[in-house]
Amino acid sequence: MKRRIVLALLLGVGTLCLSVVGAQESTKVIEVEQLRDNLFVLRGEGGGGNVAVFVTTGGVVVVDSKNPGWGQPILDEIKTLTPNPVTTVINTHSHADHVSGNAAFANTVEFVAHEVTKANMEAMRPYTGRTEPPVNVFEETNGQGLPTRTFTDRMSLGTGRDQIDLYYFGRAHTGGDAWVVFPSLRTLHAGDAFLGKRVPFLDAANGGSGVDIPDTLQKAHDTIENVDTIITGHSTQATWEDLNEWAAFNRDFLEMVRAGRTEGKTVDEIASSWVKPTRYADYDSSNAGSVRRNIQVIVEELE
């Protein structure tokens, strides 16, 4: 079930004489997909990562919260889905397009993340390949929306049909990627540890690793049980077998870089010679910049 809701936010700046000296209209379009009776995915062009909304008997659990300015539209949309209040926000990792909406949620909400993600959110360092830091909404909120509860390896929230299991298997997209499982619904939110079928973004500046990511993905696949559906970070849903294939894709990419180094190739030479294997024909590899950046990350790790 999909529907599109348009939520408009008009920002204006006026002088004392009521003349407008500047105004910006930002239209937030949220698309809602119902995966189960009580589980929804919220998407929105320009809004950042996919949001999961899990309606429990005690309240609503939200996984990730999109870019700056999207928190209130998310809250408004949730009100059309259920009268239950939001009690918990879980962040899969620290990137601004997954956590900035936190700032709009009440201070009664519990914010949960891996301990590394909390540290990354507090620092908000530039991502790998960029010089400017991301927008840090938490500076404006005096820390409101930062994680108030963290975990190291595994943690469970709720019980019975409302239970959520959180896992950490190691470095991947960042150094603190959380895997969020809804056992009763056989569904997992993987965040950007599984972007979708495309070349990954390895943010080494925030703990990501091109050397570790294949093992991390394989551990997730081999450890988590009874999951059929994966909510990806930015794409449509994936299957459990897709995760196994995603791990293989990243392992093959790593071995390709290792082989290139053994042959004495430079980063540019490895990048220009890489050809996507035919078994991954449906993977998006059109971003040559991402391919080169990931090769650079791996080469630096291997040195």
Walk through the language-model features, giving the residues of each.
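Active-site HxH/HxHxD metal-binding segment of metal-dependent hydrolases
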Residues: D76-S156, G175-D177
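Metallo-beta-lactamase
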Residues: G59-V61, N67-G69, S156, Q163-D252, ...
